[in-house]
């Protein structure tokens, strides 16, 4: 289980970030992207949080909100979370669903992502790219 890197083995990889609007983030990632909620907590030393993952993956996203904490700064427009979606029909369906929920397509900072991809901002302004590609394997 886990991923073997050249100098260590990691059991899991978590990408964590703060938000000031946890309920909207949950709506976007759970209802909009249909990511599976794999964990959550509340009032843990003043923090509430939720974790989302892809089925059978050793990595997940965590979003936290601190009681009385400051709003996280808006990220650079080239700070991206990319989902490689090889099926064009599925890509159209997910982006259509998000647009119906009120999340509109935005122009990519890097024109590479506009060639076969759709970029949509989450409630905090972080950009999600749905790229019509099989991705890269690194093998």
Swiss-Prot record:
VOC domain ranges (all copies): 9-133
PROSITE patterns for the chain: VOC
Domain of life: Bacteria
Pfam families xrefs: YycE-like_C, YycE-like_N
Protein's UniProt name: Uncharacterized protein YycE
Provenance organism: Bacillus subtilis (strain 168)
């Amino acid at each position: 289980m886990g991923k073997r890197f050249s100098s260590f083995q990691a059991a899991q990889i978590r990408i964590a970030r703060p938000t000031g609007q946890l309920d909207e983030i949950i709506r976007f990632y759970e209802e909009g992207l249909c990511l599976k909620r794999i964990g959550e907590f509340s009032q843990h030393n003043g923090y509430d949080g939720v974790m989302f993952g892809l089925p059978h993956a050793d990595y997940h996203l965590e979003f936290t909100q601190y009681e009385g904490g400051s709003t996280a700064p808006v990220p650079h427009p080239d700070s991206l979370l990319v989902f490689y979606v090889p099926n064009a029909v599925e890509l159209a369906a997910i982006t259509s669903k998000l647009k119906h929920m009120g999340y509109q397509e935005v122009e990519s900072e890097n024109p590479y992502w506009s060639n076969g991809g759709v970029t949509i901002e989450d409630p905090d302004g972080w950009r999600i790219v749905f790229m019509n590609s099989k991705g890269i394997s690194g093998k």
